[in-house]
Amino acid sequence: MKGLTLSTLSLLVCAGLSAQPNYDYSTIQREKLGRGVVCIRDNDSVTISWRYLSTDKANTAFNIYSNGKRLNPSPLVSSTFFRYPAKDKTTKYSVVPVIDGKETKEGKADYTLFKESSKPYISIPLNRPADVQIDSRMCQYSANDASVGDVDGDGEYEIILKWDCMGHDNSHEGVTGNVLIDCYKLNGKQLWRIDLGRNIRAGAHYTQFMVFDFDGDGKAELMMKTADGTKDGKGNYIGDKDANYVTNGYINKSIDGKMEPHKRYVSGRILSGAEYLTVFDGETGKALKTVDYIPSRGNIAAWGDNYGNRVDRFLACVAYLDGKHPSAVFCRGYYTRTVIAAWDWDGKELTSRWVFDSEKTDSINRITNPNALPYSGQGNHNLRVGDVDGDGCDEITYGSMAINNDGTGLYTIGMGHGDALHLMAFYPDSTSLQLWDVHENKRDGSDFRDARTGRIIFQIKSDIDVGRGMAADIDPTNPGLEMWSSSQRGYFDVNGNHHNTSTFIPQNSAVWWDGDKLRELLDRETITKFNWNTSRCEILKNFRDEGCAFNNSSKMNPCLSADIIGDWREEVIVRTRDSKELRVYTTTIPTPYRFHSFMEDIPYKISVATENVGYNQPPEPGFYFGITNNE
């Protein structure tokens, strides 16, 4: 555990946790977060919540003021949550740190709750794009996936929001509207809009956008795939603004090198033309640097088919590959060939760190071992990042395989493609990370494995496509986390024991919402809590009843869920059904616990950055967080 600062360890110890990844927090590049104060009206009271930071001393307490009047009789030490009876009037609330009995201005923060702010969420009015005509019919834009980053260096997060219009899955033909990317402050101010242009198709697998402070200047950048005709936040075009590579017509269809007897309609796909990778200024949306996307399409059929399905399967992530600085990683392909390219941005130049090509790796491995398991065809619709081998640098888990921080293969288990992937410490006393992975091949089902070696701890085989899987601590009567999938009712504990339930447990996402250390379930526009006594899920929050909607069809995910403001628990960012408003919901349920912000944990922060990628997965920390045996 060398390199972990005392304040970082205090988070792990106070939560009954153990350290897994071996980051050197004294040298690693990290963002500087502010206090994150948020005030929400809840019936006849106001809930005030704020961050406990790793820079706070362990004995830091807090006082709360309302228009200069102290509200708490004694300094608050057990949590960073406070509720106070209040009327509907404009009020300035202040959170003031107290150290050794004395108030300090350092770390003090204010929040003005206006009289008209009478709803239990932060409301952000959206600049919904105008309807567009596609194939002779009018189509509406819908707010979709989001990410967060401190783009202006004030210590608080802004929201980067993607807009889709008539988005399509890669397997479906059809013209789409242009993909748009907006940036909003939490006070509702829109900072910019980027238009990716007609040569970037709309859909869950095309635009994976990374928001992170890559160059360490204290402000987050935005990095994503672009094309000729992309217009940045300043109105400047990338490449040829008049280029049009959108296909229209039929081709002779081939899959896995075999020609099919019928033609394939490919209207709306982008099968040719320049492909770029661009880094944008997070505060202005200005394009700072554009390079050729690695890898290029090349021979489209070499990716598994010739009609644009497999060639345009993209993933992306952020990883501390050198243990100190965040790199952007952009990927292409997972059904057959996979190419993963790591990039570094220093504020001036975007340089390639390394490129992993599964075909080249497989060819080399088979020279010495003809039966070597392949790295090709192992990717999921998502990926996970963390220091799985304890060297202080991040590795990338790409479905059924893992890539070392130097761009070489770490291991492959050869179980192929899947739809869900979870990387955490599953055991209360664990000194390593584990993975829960589900597979589509109607053979391998689900596997629970060691994240460093790929060693299978246990496997639940299945003769169906296991399309969903989740892992979280939902039952305090079992040691460690629980895991489950769409293949059967019930859940498994870390020892592989099956616990049956009468119904399926929600499988898409999870959120820390109420006051305990168990995790709640986030799926189908509701937050539910698993009742281990009745083996049923009980609704805590129904966003649908409040006029909100989740995204991406069966994926049913909010725009984002993450710990972005307030205490250690997570917020849920959702759109209204008409996409005219974005709402940031934060819990108003009291908690007796005080933990540091999850965003100060490197794996958690990275998983928030990658949450918008492919099939959205919930953010997960790099340490055990849950009920321990002594509770």
Residue ranges of predicted features:
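Bacterial Sec-dependent N-terminal signal peptides
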Residues: 1-22
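Beta-propeller-forming repeat regions
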Residues: 27-34, 52-57, 75-631
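Structural beta-strand segments of beta-rich domains
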Residues: 35, 44-48
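Short, ordered beta-strand-loop transition motifs
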Residues: 40-44, 322
